[in-house]
Amino acid sequence: MTSPEGAQNKEIDCLSPEAQRLAEARLAAKRAARAEAREIRMKELERQQKEVEERPDKDFAEKGSRNMPSLSAATLASLGGTSSRRGSGDTSISMDTEASIREIKDSLAEVEEKYKKAMVSNAQLDNEKTNFMYQVDTLKDMLLELEEQLAESQRQYEEKNKEFEREKHAHSILQFQFAEVKEALRQREEMLEKHGIILNSEIATNGETSDTVNDVGYQAPTKITKEELNALKSAGEGTLGKAKEVEVKKEIVEKVGQRETLQNSEQEQPKPNTGKDCVDRGVSHPGEKAENQRPAEDSALSPGPLAGAKCEQQVQSQDQENTSDLKNSEQIESHKVTNKSDSRASNSPEQSSCLEGLDSEVPGPTEDLKTDLGKGSFEPCPDYILGQTAEIDKVTCTDSRGTGGNQREDEVQAGDTTVEDQVGTVASGPAKQSKGTENHGESCLKDGLGQSSERELTQEVAEPEEAIVQIPQAGGENTITKADDAEGRDEKPIQAEAQASPGAPINQSGHQDTTGPGSTDAQRTPPHAKERKKQGKSEQQAEALDSPQKKTKNKKKKNKKKKAATPAETCRDANEELNCQDPDVGDMEEEERLQVTDKKQASGSPEQKIRAGSREPVEDPQSGSSGKQNKVEEDGPTEGPTDILDQNSPQCEDREISPVGEKGPQCDTSQIGSEEGHVTSQHGGQAVENHNLDNSDLSGQLEGFNSESGGQAREEVGNSKSKEDCTMS
């Protein structure tokens, strides 16, 4: 009995609280039913037992009552006949009935005992039956719960089985990928072993490649050398870059000091005929290369210290490339110091020209000048450029007034000195810029020779020349007046004779027209040519101040300029239509038509244009707006008359370089356009505004010129120029 209760307790423990309450309710109901059944059975047994006890008494009474009548009847029958003889037989019948009654009572008592025992055993069996039925119910409940657990286990088994299948599939994929990666790694190792490359972070230092790239069998690791270890130890806590920068600064400071002492010592030495020697060396050897001329100039200008300094600077040039910004700043300061000393020490044209050649031949200043001219950056180098060219122009002016007859010789000498300066620049510069610097030399030679050929011309037509300089042609040709055409033919032999001597720059002059916008030739304008622009502007300011009486005439001539502006606009519209049809051929013709209109305006109001030119910088708006196309070829002949006018004018001694003009050579395309718009808004001249508009429109059209049409453009310019000379003569 105890085992089912223990099982029931376990079952109750396993069930939830609600199931436990239901099970307890069922058990309580069953107990109550069993208790009632026991009470009913006990009452029934007691009643049955009472009946059994009462029945023998009733049976005995009933038997006695039945026997008495029978006996009486028997006795009466026996007694009615022979009563005496039948008396013994009646006594024996009574004895038999009593014995049978006793036997019946004994058997009845035995049956009652058996019945009682059967009732007790029946009750016990009933109790056992109820207990077994309760156990069956509990076992049924446990079976249901186990069935539920089995179903849950089966569901979990299915989920685990599916998850296992997924993991198995992923494992197979990863195993396949692992095999592929392993194969790729094996191939990589084979390739590395084939080429002899060893992958190790401790082998290569500072990006050095291993020496075993081309050697298959040799795989020894490259180690840090003793010099690198010493360099790392000497650096200390600071980085290698800072230590190297400090060393480079020290070297630059020492080099600048040596350069200053060298140039000061050379300036103090008297050189009586150095200018003529420079001309002879720069002109008399046309077959020599720029590299052959450079050692001769170095030996003539500096006997010992210059050569030593030059070699030292060439040795240290590799260290200077790593710190180009520091080098440029230090060299700019050195140029300022040396050029101030040059301007104080220069007393003759020969000494100033030779010092200019010396500065161009020293490697340091040459590289600085190369970066200033090539990049067109806004660095403080205009002080250095002005310091040299101002001296040359002032000395040439005084010499032209003093010598008189030797005027042409001095101009040739100045031009040849400039050529020698540019040849020195060619020799010291890199090979990729040799073509551009030789073109500069050729343009400088044209500048010097143009001064000697047009000096007498500009004395007669000084004022019209001032106005025409402001309107240069975009094709590299200069505007020439009637006086220029008349006297230019007589001076052709002089120009040809002067141009025959320097051969190397002139041979390469044919390449200048073919350069497109933004080329190296257009970016490198000689510094003395830029200075002559500034001096021409200051000359025009001086003439405008000295002639206040002409201002009243300018008011009367404004109406003429307004009338002259309309032909320029109509000509510009016609030129735009012609450019749409024939852009290669029509550009030069419309430029010539525009120049005829500009010359009429210049001849009609020269004083007003000189007054406007005194405020407006003499620059080429076409070349500025079109990327300075062919600016080297334009500056040579165009700026020559301006310089000659400065030398022949009475205000030559009193002229000063205006601070506004110093910014002119460094201006780029946007600054030139903004400066022109500002100038036209100040003095409000209709003619100058129309010229700027026409030239800016033509500059946009000239951008379509390429290097292939350069030869055709030059031929058309020559033909149109000859036709123009005939018509104007």
Swiss-Prot record:
UniProt biased composition (Basic and acidic residues): 40-65, 277-297, 327-343, 435-445, 482-494, 608-618, 713-729
GO biological process, one term: regulation of DNA-templated transcription
Subcellular location: Nucleus; Cytoplasm
Chief localisation class: nucleus
Positions carrying N-acetylthreonine: T2
Biased composition (Polar residues): 260-272, 313-326, 344-354, 506-523, 667-684, 693-710
Low complexity bias spans: 78-94
Residue ranges of coiled coil: 94-194
Domain of life per record: Eukaryota
UniProt keyword annotations, A-Z: Acetylation, Coiled coil, Cytoplasm, DNA-binding, Isopeptide bond, Nucleus, Phosphoprotein, Repressor, Transcription, Transcription regulation, Ubl conjugation
Gene Ontology terms for molecular function: DNA binding
Sequence similarity: Belongs to the LRRFIP family.
Function summary: Transcriptional repressor which preferentially binds to the GC-rich consensus sequence (5'-AGCCCCCGGCG-3') and may regulate expression of TNF, EGFR and PDGFA. May control smooth muscle cells proliferation following artery injury through PDGFA repression. May also bind double-stranded RNA. Positively regulates Toll-like receptor (TLR) signaling in response to agonist probably by competing with the negative FLII regulator for MYD88-binding.
Domain notes: The DNA-binding domain is intrinsically unstructured.
Name under which the protein is recorded: Leucine-rich repeat flightless-interacting protein 1
Record organism: Mus musculus
Gene label: Lrrfip1
